[in-house]
Amino acid sequence: MWINQQDLGIDNIFTDDLIYIESWGPKYENRELLKHWFNEWNTRGKVLIWDIKQFFHKDNQTIVEWYFKNKMNTGNFEEFDGISLVVWTKDNKIKELKEFGCNLNNYNPYEESDIPQFRDEKVNWF
């Protein structure tokens, strides 16, 4: 859906009253707002990769680990690893989805000292 920039079934996947929270703060509290966000976002950027690495499912909950990369119309690229916590209804629709992001640019702050040496760089938004 995101890769193709087409709504291929939001109505069939999500409940009317879903709660969808992005890793950096935005919260969409119903399906119509989620559809608006999807359509509006796709005017500003393109998802290049959204690969599922693994998932764990139990009862009505799923945890999904994924890798994400996009290119915005400004020319900026964003990429990060993420996890989604998904809660399902009895009729297999998503009623809650919460994203968490993880920076790909990892390092050991204790590599050269017992005192942490943090990089002087902009911290990602998640």
Tell what function each PLM region has.
Residues 43-44, 69-79:
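Short, cysteine-centered beta-strand-loop-beta hairpins and adjacent loop/turn segments enriched
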Residues 48-51, 65, 78-84:
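Short, surface-exposed coil-to-beta transition loops
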Residues 77-108:
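A contiguous, mid-protein "functional segment" used to position or interact
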Residues 98-126:
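Low-complexity, intrinsically disordered terminal/linker segments enriched in charged
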Residues 59-68:
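A short hydrophobic beta-strand element
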Residues 1-12, 16, 117-126:
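Short, low-complexity N-terminal intrinsically disordered segments enriched in polar/charged residues
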Residues 7-60:
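A solvent-exposed, acidic/Ser-Thr-rich amphipathic alpha-helical stretch
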